[in-house]
């Protein structure tokens, strides 16, 4: 038998051995039909922290007002927030957060969602009582508010962005519920122009490096920075 023939026979033998090994490794499994929902980790609907709905959800929504985050200028109430929302327990359970920071949440009574100290330094927004509810809408073009926002978002990132506990950060801050719209037709100070809005968004872009950033609407800065979009939680 010449060398070429011997080589061909050897190759055929090796292929045969290989096929035999693969055949011995094949494992067949039969799955039972299951119509129930199953966990889709960190994707989909996120009930609010503290809600009893969907107790097995591994993603929870946490909304923080500026007033509760920074009650005194430059001092952040992390211990109070951790205790109020039971964040240590959520971490132990492997639950992750969707975080939104807000300045104006319409409610049933007149109230402030920014800190008293910040209101005292600005006070150029609009108190309102509309079909949305009651509250105070800041003038987001105010330079003092802008500078303070840069600092508080940096503090939020320093506290929440290091350990992966917060998976998503919704770019709130502006407008009612942090949704980037204001009922200005009722006489409220309107939303700032795109240049100023982009400055607020840039605060988040510069501060957070681990959490995925989301916007309520596909503004130009969201497109150019490949941000995700979210619907209300």
Language model regions located:
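Bacterial Sec-dependent signal peptides at the C-terminal "C-region" and cleavage site
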Residues: 15-30
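Short, flexible loop/turn elements at secondary-structure junctions
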Residues: 64-68, 73, 101-105, 164, ...
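Short aromatic-enriched loop/helix-cap "lid" or pocket-rim segments at secondary-structure transitions
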Residues: 110-112, 180-184
């Amino acid at each position: 038998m010449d060398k070429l023939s011997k080589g061909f026979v050897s190759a055929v033998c090796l292929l045969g051995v290989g096929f035999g090994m693969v055949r011995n490794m094949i494992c067949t499994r039969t799955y039972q039909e299951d119509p129930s929902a199953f966990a889709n980790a960190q994707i989909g609907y996120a009930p609010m922290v503290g809600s009893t709905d969907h107790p097995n959800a591994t993603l929870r929504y946490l909304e923080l007002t500026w007033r509760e985050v920074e009650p005194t200028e430059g001092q952040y109430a992390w211990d109070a927030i951790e205790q109020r929302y039971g964040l240590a327990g959520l971490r132990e359970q492997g639950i992750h957060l969707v975080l939104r920071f807000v300045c104006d949440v319409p409610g049933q009574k007149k109230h402030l969602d920014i800190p008293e100290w910040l209101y005292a330094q600005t006070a150029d927004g609009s108190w309102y009582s509309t079909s949305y509810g009651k509250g105070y809408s800041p003038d987001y073009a105010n330079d003092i508010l802008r500078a303070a926002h840069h600092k508080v978002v940096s503090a939020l990132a320093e506290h929440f962005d290091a350990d992966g506990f917060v998976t998503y950060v919704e770019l709130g801050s502006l407008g009612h519920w942090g949704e980037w719209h204001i009922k200005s037709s009722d006489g409220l100070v309107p939303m700032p122009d795109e240049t100023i809005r982009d400055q607020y968004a840039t605060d988040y872009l510069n501060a957070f490096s681990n959490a995925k950033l989301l916007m309520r609407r596909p503004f130009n800065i969201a497109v150019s920075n490949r941000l995700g979009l979210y619907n209300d939680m």
